[in-house]
Amino acid sequence: MDDRFDTVLAANNRYTRSSYFEWTAALRRVIALPLLSVAFFSAVGQSLQPGHLPSRKQVAPMAPAEEKNLAFVLDWWRKVIDARHTELAANYAAEDFIQHNPNIPTGRAALVTFFKSLGPAIEPIPDRLANPPILEGARGNFVWLVFEHKFKNPKDAAQSVYEYSFDLFRIQDGKIQEHWDAARKDPGSPAFIPSTAPPPSTWNTVKPSAAEQQNLAIATRFEKNVVEYGHIEDIEELLSSSFIEHNPVEPVDREGLKHFIHSLPDHQSQDIKPEWKNAPALEFTNGPFVVMMWEKSYKDPSDPTREYTRDHFAILRIEGGRIQEIWD
């Protein structure tokens, strides 16, 4: 556990975009593989906030073609990821599949090699996912999934902790062409090769409705004005009185979150500028949901002279002109 982890636990750097993923990514090394280190979780146990409950299953509204894309990704996950039937990978992933997880080389062949190394295929292929997503949606050629992972709080065995992992896919020509998640690079994993793919925003071609544009403006105001520039006075206007925060190291409700942000030592109110301090690499709407993804560079744990890129996510559900829930 490095010094940056200690800093995150002390000041929860979600608000500088190094985020809660600084410790939850240690629980989830790679796609579909939530891992728990008891010693590590014990170290962060004192930072867990009480009152968090499991999320209810929610599905974003989709057009028929988008529903087809979602079903395609879930079928791939069940057969290739969960059951490790890598002989089926070519049915789902493009040969030049682009991988943004820093622990897995890019390309379909590398994906097959990686999942073969995890063990034999499961026979027969299960009818259902081992851990179905609690949030799922598709917008244009993007498919997004949020998974919930339940653990026991080492400081209180009666209390459960709910941690979330995020996966984003881009579909092209009927195949999975690109994948992003929030994994942190592990020491000893293959050398990270930066992607030369076009920025993810390039593929965001669906025009949002007027209501979705309003939702995006609300999400932007929260993430930019409140999170980046520290204007907590906007919270009561932006967040519902019944707001739920699903990040387990943050207070679960609106008032708690307001006081939490105010207490951060580096989060005094600043003059709001037109530009973001760290603009999202991708943002899109999906009915009441706003999906945002940021990219950030980190030192490679295997080679401090090199850097790698990690992705950070926030999913905001907005109804009635207020943010109702956030997963991050």
What are these regions (language model features)?
Residues 46-328:
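C-terminal and inter-domain tail/linker signature
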Residues 11, 35-36, 177, 324:
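Enrichment for repetitive, rod-forming helical segments
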Residues 1, 14-17, 36-37, 162, ...:
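N-terminal leader/targeting signatures
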Residues 1-27:
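N-terminal secretory signal peptides that target proteins for export/translocation
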Residues 7, 23, 42-43, 99:
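Generic detector of N-terminal low-structure segments
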Residues 30-42:
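Bacterial N-terminal signal peptides
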